[in-house]
């Protein structure tokens, strides 16, 4: 009887869920039933064990390769042509390459800025008079006669505003989409070229202009007089004088200020210049997938971040730190540099910053920006047939028309825009899909297989740690029957532990996904700081 009882208990023990052979023979994990088959160790079981371990090793290698690839945060670039019913016309800023009109410079102006403009030397005498035209030299001698002269207070902002080229005199003709436009449609703005003007700036309170068609005649067309007879005589190398004649133009978004001295293109007199544009919407990824800046701009001058706003803000701070003043075109309410500060500090400091200092002004690319691709073509104006007509129309000589008149025609090539977007090449879903596919290929496992392993570990934990407690509470069986009687209390405990195990598994999956999603971003952000 005792032997029969022992055999019965061994049989029951071998059928426990925590028994490894029971688990292996019931698991969906491929190869486990052959490795832990009942009976003695055989060569066949050894081969199955070797194959399983080899497959498991390959699985770990491939999974680690996928994980490493994910943490490289790769991205791809998507290019798309998007048709639109209408497009917002860009802001168009232009500046005369000559900053100051010679006829508007007074004796007091010349006294204060003569040396800055290389018109006078340090002794307030005309520099290089042999280089001047007779008419210019005569006018300059009258203004440079300082005997008994008492200088008045001088203001650089007023000087730039008063002597800069006036759009009411420069603008000869203007049309947008075939309708006439006027100087009032242009906003005055200051750049390093002095007094400039922006069409469709959005700063005058008027709604932004749109275009409904592509091609010439559906954009902005202006005829300008660059007024070369007002150009300052050039007798030396300064930042305030120019060797060229014409205008500098920048086509930009209304969300960014013009940076025309660095990003503008030139338009020469005597030509009609056609500028065919295409709007480009650029979308970049933030760290760790890309290098763009998604944070708002930390500036007291600009609310919207852009590369040009960042550079202007940086240049302003650089001059305030090194010269204790700002240039006229720079934002803010700080003290404007005097002519002496311009010559001795501001101009040299800004030139050094732009040309040589590559570490001070480091501006990240914004995550969302609009750019305009351009194609330029030119034709000669005036033609021989129109020269006399234009001379009569504007009451000028034919030579003046050739030397001073230009036409600028800006339009969209077509009513569509390019969308260039960076996208994540490998996301969490792809990582989990690859790992799941490799698990199925090498060991035939799935998420439910992992659940089986958790369930088995729960059974082992219950038998090893709680077995003694459960056996003490198990009711005694009579020797006359083989029925196993389980109390309701034991069933409740088992159910609670099983539910807790499943909840732990669910939490594990959730935490794994959260770690995959948020940990890379946190690591990337900390490394960026």
From Swiss-Prot:
One GO MF term: ligand-gated sodium channel activity
Pfam hit, one: ASC
Reaction(s) the record says it catalyses: Na(+)(in) = Na(+)(out); K(+)(in) = K(+)(out); Li(+)(in) = Li(+)(out); Ca(2+)(in) = Ca(2+)(out)
Keywords: Cell membrane, Cell projection, Disulfide bond, Glycoprotein, Ion channel, Ion transport, Membrane, Postsynaptic cell membrane, Sodium, Sodium channel, Sodium transport, Synapse, Transmembrane, Transmembrane helix, Transport
Biological process according to GO: cellular response to pH; sodium ion transmembrane transport
Bilayer topology annotation: Multi-pass membrane protein
Cellular compartments per GO CC: dendrite; plasma membrane; postsynaptic membrane
Activity modulation comment: Inhibited by the diuretic drug amiloride.
Subcellular location: Cell membrane; Postsynaptic cell membrane; Cell projection, Dendrite
Entry keyword annotation includes Disulfide bond: yes
Residue ranges crossing the lipid bilayer per the database entry: 52-68, 428-458
Tissue expression notes: Expressed in central nervous system.
Topology feature Extracellular, residues: 69-427
Site (Involved in channel desensitization): 81
InterPro entries found in the cross-reference section: ENaC, ENaC_chordates, ENaC_CS
Annotated PROSITE patterns: ASC
Motif (GAS motif): 444-446
Side Cytoplasmic, residues: 1-51, 459-529
PANTHER family tied to this protein: ACID-SENSING ION CHANNEL 1, AMILORIDE-SENSITIVE SODIUM CHANNEL-RELATED
Domain description: The second transmembrane domain (TM2) is a discontinuous alpha-helix disrupted by the GAS motif, which forms the selectivity filter by adopting an extended, belt-like conformation aligned approximately parallel to the membrane plane. This peptide belt encircles the waist of the channel and divides TM2 into two discontinuous helical segments. The distal helical segment of TM2 interacts with the cytoplasmic portion of the first transmembrane domain (TM1) from a neighboring subunit, contributing to the structural and functional integrity of the channel.
Family: Belongs to the amiloride-sensitive sodium channel (TC 1.A.6) family. ASIC1 subfamily.
The name this protein goes by in its record: Acid-sensing ion channel 1C
Organism encoding this protein: Danio rerio (Zebrafish)
